[in-house]
Design a protein with these regions (language model features):
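A conserved ligand/cofactor-binding region detector
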Residues: 1-122
Length: 122
C-alpha cells in the first residue's frame, strides 16, 4: 500500500466514520483512522490466508487466552506489515508523526500471567 493510498483511506475513515474534516482532525482521531485502515488491511490478509488454508485443507489450531500483556499494537502492526515508511509519509500530509499517534494508543494489558504471554508468542 502506498502513502497516497493510506492517506486517502484515512481521509475516508475521518470523513465518513468520524464526520470530521481531515485538516481539522486531532491526533486521537488520526490514531483511530490509522488503526481502522490497518485493521482493514489485516482483515484482507486474514481472508486471503483463510481461503488458501481452506483450499489446501490444512488444519487449524485455536488457543484462547485473556491473560496476556501484549502492550500497544499500532507500532508493531505497522512494522510487521512493512508499512512504517508509507504511513510516516502519509501522516506528514496531516501534519503529524507516528510517535504522536503511538502516544494516543491505550495500553490493552489484560492479566499478568505467564501462560497467556507465552501463548501470545506463537
Amino acid at each position: 500500500m502506498t502513502a497516497e493510498q493510506i492517506r486517502l483511506a484515512m481521509e475516508n475513515k475521518l470523513e465518513y466514520l468520524m464526520e470530521v474534516k481531515p485538516q481539522l482532525a486531532s491526533d486521537d482521531q488520526l490514531y483511530k483512522a490509522a488503526a481502522l485502515v490497518l485493521r482493514d488491511l489485516m482483515v484482507e490478509k486474514r481472508r486471503a490466508h483463510r481461503a488458501k488454508t481452506t483450499a489446501e485443507r490444512k488444519k487449524r489450531i485455536h488457543y484462547l487466552s485473556m491473560e496476556f500483556l501484549m502492550g500497544k499494537s499500532l507500532k508493531n502492526s505497522l512494522y510487521n506489515l512493512g508499512l512504517v515508511e508509507p504511513f510516516t509519509e502519509a501522516l506528514t500530509a496531516f501534519g503529524t508523526t507516528p510517535e504522536r499517534l503511538f502516544a494516543c494508543e491505550p495500553d490493552p494489558g489484560l492479566g499478568n500471567g505467564g501462560l497467556g504471554r507465552l501463548a501470545a508468542c506463537y
